[in-house]
């Protein structure tokens, strides 16, 4: 497998947003997110993201095809619902980087691309003066009816990267899941690493 992984910034991010939107819709449709993606919402969300100063999109290319992507930007440029749990606990978000989605098509998993995504995002965070990074992962019950029998959570991978769950630090985000008529609120657990 010959995959090129590289960070995109500025105008390069804008050029890759359609690919990122399609990847989000495709990858997040699966468990544990079960996201019923909406192209209009994706365009708005990603345009906001691309406008954030110091944002980076790390893309994985198989030839010219984007097969994976991961995003990061300073937490202070994220929406209030992402910042609020930190601010409520008195955590300074001015030197905190938020790692957004990390999406990779299934055929490309298990080849070190996830590590490359973290390496590039962490490097951008350090370049921008951050002393910590965080991300949020959806919380699902162990007996969730949509959970595949062979599902393997990423907790051990994240822990090997130096990230840990921050107890009681969660956000609530709403999205429409497959089979539902309306959005429902989901709990997102924050993981964090300092350096």
Residue ranges and their predicted role:
Residues 1-18, 22, 26:
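Conserved N-terminal entry element of GNAT/NAT acetyltransferase domains
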Residues 21-37:
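Helix-loop element at the rim of GNAT/NAT acetyltransferase active sites that forms part
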Residues 33-62, 71:
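Active-site rim helix/loop that mediates acceptor-substrate recognition in acyltransferases
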Residues 54-59, 69, 101, 188-190:
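Short hydrophobic/aromatic beta-strand element in the GNAT-like acyltransferase core
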Residues 69-102, 145-146, 151, 169-184:
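Conserved acyl-donor/pantetheine-binding loop and adjacent beta-alpha core of acyl/acetyltransferases
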Residues 96-99, 118, 125-150:
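Conserved GNAT acetyl-CoA-binding A-motif
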Residues 101-104, 110-125:
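Conserved acetyl-CoA-binding loop-helix of GNAT-fold acetyltransferases
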Residues 154-168:
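Conserved acetyl-CoA-binding loop of GNAT-fold acetyltransferases
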């Amino acid at each position: 497998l010959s995959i090129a992984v590289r960070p995109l910034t500025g105008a390069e991010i804008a050029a890759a947003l359609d690919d990122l939107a399609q990847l989000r819709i495709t990858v997040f449709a699966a468990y544990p997110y079960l996201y019923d993606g909406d192209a209009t919402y994706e365009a708005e969300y990603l345009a906001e993201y691309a406008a954030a100063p110091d944002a980076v999109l790390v893309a994985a290319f198989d030839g010219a095809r984007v097969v994976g992507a991961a995003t990061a930007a300073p937490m202070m440029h994220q929406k209030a619902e992402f910042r609020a749990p930190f601010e409520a606990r008195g955590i300074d978000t001015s030197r905190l980087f938020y790692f957004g989605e990390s999406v990779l098509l299934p055929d490309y998993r298990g080849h070190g691309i996830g590590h490359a995504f973290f390496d590039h995002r962490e490097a951008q965070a350090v370049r921008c003066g951050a002393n910590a990074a965080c991300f949020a992962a959806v919380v699902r019950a162990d007996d969730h009816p949509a959970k595949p029998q062979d599902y393997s959570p990423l907790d051990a991978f994240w822990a090997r990267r130096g990230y840990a769950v921050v107890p009681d630090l969660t956000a609530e985000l709403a999205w429409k899941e497959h089979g539902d008529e309306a959005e429902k609120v989901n709990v997102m657990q924050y993981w964090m690493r300092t350096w």
